[in-house]
Amino acid sequence: MAKIILRHLIETPVRYQEEFEARGLEDCRLDHALYALPGPTIEDLRKARGTPKALAEDSDSAETPPGEGKSRFQILLDVVQFLPEDIIIQTFEGWLLIKAQHGTRMDEHGFISRSFTRQYKLPDGVETKDLSAILCHDGILVVEVKDPLETK
């Protein structure tokens, strides 16, 4: 098997490089897409994993599993380097601000400090109370707004 050249470490975190080499680039395209922001919805990923040609089909033709609402707005961020208390999520005048920063820490190469700030324009009519954020065990931060029709 030929080696795969990975050009962007933000899109392909180091911890996944061995998996990509073992499975091949084509098999990992959906996993790789998680790190392009704003990310695809979880429903799109589930549809695509079930049938490889699902990305080419119209999204309205696929059914949503029962009990699983559609998200109008969703962001996936890889924040594995940060502790939950290092992450700040704010809204301001229709914008979602996500900030994270940690002080100097020791790693395998020496000392490092990291920080980032991301801004996303919220859809019209979205209020702070409509947002939910989940930090998954694998270091992925999911911020989303559920469809208001789901609550009715």
Swiss-Prot record:
Q: Where is this region: Disordered?
A: 48-69
**Organism per entry:** Rattus norvegicus (Rat)
One Pfam family in the UniProt entry: HSP20
Protein name per Swiss-Prot or TrEMBL: Heat shock protein beta-3
Query: Which keywords does this chain's UniProt record carry?
Result: Cytoplasm, Nucleus, Stress response
Q: What does this protein do?
A: Inhibitor of actin polymerization.
Protein family (similarity comment): Belongs to the small heat shock protein (HSP20) family.
Which residue ranges does the record assign to the sHSP domain?
A: 55-152
User: PANTHER family given for it?
Assistant: HEAT SHOCK PROTEIN BETA-3
Q: What is the lineage of its organism?
A: Eukaryota, Metazoa, Chordata, Craniata, Vertebrata
What are the disulphide bonds in this sequence?
A: none
Give the InterPro entries listed for this entry. A-crystallin/Hsp20_dom, Alpha-crystallin/sHSP_animal, HSP20-like_chaperone, HSPB3
Instruction: List the record's Gene Ontology CC terms alphabetically.
Output: cytoplasm; nuclear speck; nucleus
Q: Where in the cell is it found?
A: Cytoplasm; Nucleus
